[in-house]
Amino acid sequence: MSRRTAIIAGSRTPFVRSGTVFKDLTAIDLGVLAVRELMDRSGVRGEDVDHLVYGTVVHDPHAPNIAREVGLATLPKTVPAVTVSRACATANQSIADAANLIERGYADVVVAGGSESLTHIPITIKQALAEKLIGASKAKTLGARLGTLAKIR
């Protein structure tokens, strides 16, 4: 049997151009700000939250489970958190997954959302370039460093 669900509150950070106002904030930082504001606005206490569903499209290789990171910073550590990713619709997928948890009786209160920081996207490079950059960083003299960098094509 399906239960009815309701969205009781929402919050968000403003859209800003990459590399500007929020340049020092990661997707996790933005998520923490939004969830804290959500909890304040809604009056829901952390101990009343049964689950956190949170996502991002461009995952930080240093913190690939954004939901757990945001959850640990905003909710009791006993609240399970799952990370979702769906290109251009991650927050919507998080909300749909949260509604499903409630409808199916697995949870009563779920926090759902997503955040992104295009200022902090991981940039991958070819192995040959990586080796040259590492070689340049290990060079003992400026001349050796420049010589290594000059080989980049």
Model feature map: region roles:
Residues 48-55, 111:
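Short glycine-rich phosphate-binding loop at a beta-alpha junction
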